[in-house]
Amino acid sequence: MNFYKIKILILISFIVFSATLESQIVDIETSRKEDLVGTKISLNLGFDGSSGTVDRTNYSIGTRFDFNNEVWNRFLIFNYSRREKDERINEDNTFLHLRFARKISSIIAAEFFIQTNEKPLEKIEERNHIVKGRRHSPIKNLRLGVGLFDENEKRINLDERNTVRANTYLNYLFNISNNTSINT
């Protein structure tokens, strides 16, 4: 069996294995900028609309702040989006994530984050997480993590719910070629 076929077989195995696992409660792996040292700030604004048979208005705002040094990785992400069709709102989402990760060694990091989001059209008035965790990177592109979540959820027309839960995750960045990869 040649090397190309082995890569395809491994890729299919990761996809099947990932589909059978329960997904992370908070998936932020693709948002990490671990190799960045220094400060980076980005701001995204979006607006589009159309008028005619159907009137549509969509707008969004997103910002990200990264403050990293050799020991600490810190970032803040904020997103808001709203979509309307014929004066009816069909999306109105707010998301805020603040994370601190401290490198303990070359393969271990301790993490803390707070996250809040609101999705009133999905009956989520407010969902807040406070999380402490530990992350291991035993080999390049592999991340293993465990976290303890304190979750508070307020749903529209339902009682408020507090939950403490543990979360584990496995994340692997599978490189197919120099400019193509899949994050599982």
State each model region's role.
Residues 1-36:
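Cleavable N-terminal export/targeting peptides
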Residues 47-51, 67-69, 80-84, 114-120, ...:
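Transmembrane beta-strands of outer-membrane beta-barrel pores
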Residues 43-47, 61-67, 98-102, 132-136, ...:
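Residues on the lipid-exposed face of transmembrane beta-strands in outer-membrane beta-barrel proteins
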Residues 39, 70-76, 107-110, 140-144, ...:
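Repeated loop/turn-to-beta-strand initiation elements of outer-membrane beta-barrel proteins
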Residues 37-39, 55-59, 90-94, 126-130, ...:
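Residues that define the transmembrane beta-barrel architecture of outer-membrane proteins
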Residues 143-184:
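Outer-membrane beta-barrel transmembrane domain signature
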Residues 25-73:
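Short glycine/proline- and aromatic-enriched beta-strand/turn motifs that initiate or cap beta-hairpins
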Residues 43-45, 76-78, 112, 132, ...:
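Membrane-embedded beta-strand positions of outer-membrane beta-barrel proteins
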